[in-house]
Design a protein with these regions (language model features):
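Transmembrane alpha-helix/helix-exit interface in multi-pass inner-membrane proteins
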Residues: 13, 17-21, 79-96
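Membrane-interfacial catalytic/cofactor-binding modules of polytopic membrane enzymes
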Residues: 93, 97-115
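Membrane-interface loop-to-helix entry segments
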Residues: 38-56, 110-124
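Membrane-interface capping segments at transmembrane-helix boundaries
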Residues: 135-137, 189-195
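Conserved small/polar residues in nucleotide/adenosyl-binding loops
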Residues: 1-4
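Small-residue-rich transmembrane alpha-helices that serve as helix-helix interface/gating elements
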Residues: 172-187
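Internal transmembrane alpha-helix with an interfacial aromatic "cap," most often the third helix
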Residues: 11, 27-30, 47-71
Length: 195
């Protein structure tokens, strides 16, 4: 996954840099100095996170779609799956002081336009992954890796839901994020059992 990771990291670093300078596509925000190191004023961990959850989101989409999986459908559902993760990520990172919004939004201080920007950026990430992964990436010997990626997406959804409900004591984020990630995860896991 070196090539896919490199392309995703470079592209999302550029998107994040443009975002902090122009407000597009997420809205006006700025990274604090809490996350280091930074590249072009973007914490290095941020583009890595896009890739680290992009692959599981894509595989969850593929598994959920089953026999109806096509590149366009994987891109669309994978983008929704990745954006659903941000329903947990952004409230946590804003709460920890890793980035700040110029104007508080209605969802835990996050503007709703951020999630539109996430979906648009996720479309680019999913399109890149679709182009860079070979057409047979989902057959002949990849079942274990694919299952692990579905497991990772599901684990993140479950643990984030429990974490916000129990430890962060934020039932709103637990419910909203859970409703975003867990249905996709459940259908993806069922798809793995369908075979």
């Amino acid at each position: 996954y070196k090539r896919q990771g490199t392309v995703t990291a470079v592209a999302t670093t550029a998107v994040e840099r443009v975002g902090t300078q122009t407000g597009l596509p997420f809205g006006r925000y700025a990274y604090t100095t809490a996350l280091q190191p930074q590249v072009a004023h973007v914490p290095a961990i941020v583009p890595l996170a896009w890739f680290a959850m992009g692959l599981p989101a894509r595989e969850a989409a593929h598994s959920a779609l089953g026999a109806h999986s096509t590149p366009a459908r994987r891109i669309a559902l994978g983008s929704a799956a990745l954006t659903a993760w941000d329903l947990f990520l952004d409230p946590q990172m804003v709460g920890e002081g890793y980035w700040v919004w110029a104007r508080r939004g209605i969802y835990r201080g996050i503007p709703l336009g951020n999630f539109v920007g996430w979906f648009v950026t996720s479309l680019g990430v999913m399109t890149a992954l679709e182009a860079l992964l070979p057409p047979n990436a989902y057959v002949d010997g990849s079942a274990d890796a694919d299952g692990a990626l579905v497991g990772e997406y599901t684990f993140m959804g479950v643990m984030e839901t429990i974490g916000f409900a129990r430890f962060f004591r934020d039932p709103t984020v637990a419910i909203v994020g859970g409703l975003g990630m867990l249905p996709i995860a459940a259908v993806a896991v069922a798809g793995k059992f369908r075979g």
